[in-house]
Amino acid sequence: MPKVSEQHLEARKKQIVSAAFLCFARKGFHPTTMQDICTEAGLSAGAVYRYFPSKESIIATACDVS
């Protein structure tokens, strides 16, 4: 199986963060679920959890506070 490029990994992270921020803007942070983010990003739960274990980790990555 070929390795996934760093560019692909970064693009996928940005896709998930963008989807999360759209959900947060619509529903607020606490009411937004990881499933909402998965749906908005058009990805499976497994794909999203591969990059981020929680909503908090998405925010930390977006804010560069990890």
Please report, for each region that a protein language model flagged, where it lies by residue.
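Residues within the helices of the helix-turn-helix
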Residues: 4, 35, 46
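Short helix/strand-capping hinge loops at secondary-structure junctions
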Residues: 23-32, 52
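Ser/Thr-centered, proline-biased regulatory motifs
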Residues: 30-39, 56
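DNA-binding alpha-helical recognition surfaces that contact promoter or target DNA
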Residues: 36, 50, 60-61
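Short hydrophobic/aromatic patch on the recognition helix
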Residues: 42-52
